Structures are given as C-alpha cells and as structure tokens.
Amino acid sequence: MRGLFLLLFFPILSFGQLTKSGFRHTNPTLYVDWSGKIGSGKGLERFGKKTISFVCGNTLTIAHVTSGGVAPENKTVTYSTVKSSLSGSEKCWITQNLGSTSQAISETDATEAAAGWYWQFNKKKGYKNNGTTTFPTFPSTNSNTETSNWGASTDPCTLELGSGWRIPTVTEWTNVNNANLRAQAYAGALKMHAAGYISIGTSSALTDRGSKFFYWSSTYSDVTYAKGLVIYTNTTYNQISNNDKDAGLSVRCIRD
C-alpha cells in the first residue's frame, strides 16, 4: 500500500514551482513537471522532469540573489520577452529594465518598480535607488578607466539571465535609434522608459527619473566615456552619446 500511494501521488508534484535559496541556473532552460506545468527549476535536480529550450515570447523567471555580486537585493522577477528586428536583425529582448519588478506603464513611469537597477560601465555590481537613497553605496570617485568593451565576465545580462543574454552593442542601439525611435521607444515592442541615471561624485544623486532614458551599450569610447542611448521625453532628442563610465545607467538585455 505504501508503494501504491507513492506511485499515485508522485506524478502530480509541481516540481517546477520549487526553489532553493542560493542556487541559480546559467542556461535558458525551463522545466516541465509531470502535470505539464512549466517552472524555472533553478537549483533543482532534473529527476522526474524533461527540459525544453527557452522560447522568446514566453516569460523568463529569475531568482536574483546578492551572493553573486551582481544583484543589489534578493528578489524574483518574471521578465516578459519579445522578438524584434529593431537592432538590425531578429533578436530576443526583455521588455523591461534588468532588475525591475515590473514593466513600465508609460514612458515617464518614475516608480522604483519599473526603473530596475543601475550599472557603471563594464562593472557587474548593480545599484538600486528608492528615490532618495542608492544601495549599495555608489562609488564617489572616478576610477573606471579601462579601455575595453563590456565583457561576458562582468555583463549583468549574462550573469543574471544566463548564457546567450547580453547588453546590446552600440551598433544594435544605433539601429534601434534609427528606427523611428522617438515614436517607438515605449509605444513599440521594447517598452523603453525614462528611468534616469545615478550621477557621479560624492552626492551620487538619482537624476531625471521619469524624464530621460539612459541605456548602456557594451561599447567603450575611451578611458573616460562609453557609448549609450539617450532619450529625452520632453523634446525630440534621442541619440547615441558618450556617457561617463562612472555614472549609473539602466541596462536592457538582448539574446541572439
């Protein structure tokens, strides 16, 4: 009877809903339990499950943890994804900023939930700002002087979402910018919005949240600056610009 009970009960366990603190996956694999329910399966054994490859257009649930030195807080986020050719060829994009709790509800959404986290160029550590305070403490000196593009070992998209995810190159952002961006920034597929930036210096103030977009590319300019996409909501200004590498800008993630 004991064996019969286990046989009848075991197939309906929702393995995909279990999580284990401190474990992460590093590949875009979803897990399907025997009841047909899909879950992330991060940190779980594959016993009793089959795997399927991630399909763009589906949601991607990530358990962000601070122990990896990237996320500034522990939280689980379900990211929406979309296929788009705005970058010049078809890619998969998340439709919200990395670290955001939810997709923005407008291009001027000034909430912390929509803003997500901020990064200095070519650094893996993310920072959050609740509107008044940045955590962890933002560096107050200009020390980011390396002359290299953002690499996979420090790319927060790769480290947090898994292999294949990355920060867009300046060429990809340029193509996005040239595709009627001012009209399509939020209204289009990518749902981009004005999360502002964290300024450099001793104040490290949150600036322009709700009025300006600042997105890093993976491409550096020189010892001081790196390329990024900037959009102003109150004008027709949108362009690829040089941004101080020590400033904290938003990150969007793309997958080939």
Question: Model-predicted segments: where are they?
Answer:
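GGW-centered surface loops in extracellular recognition modules
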Residues: 43-113
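A structural detector for beta-sheet-dominated domains
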Residues: 26, 33-35, 55, 63, ...
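Enriched but not universal
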Residues: 17-67, 75, 252-256
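Bacterial Sec-dependent N-terminal signal peptides
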Residues: 1-20
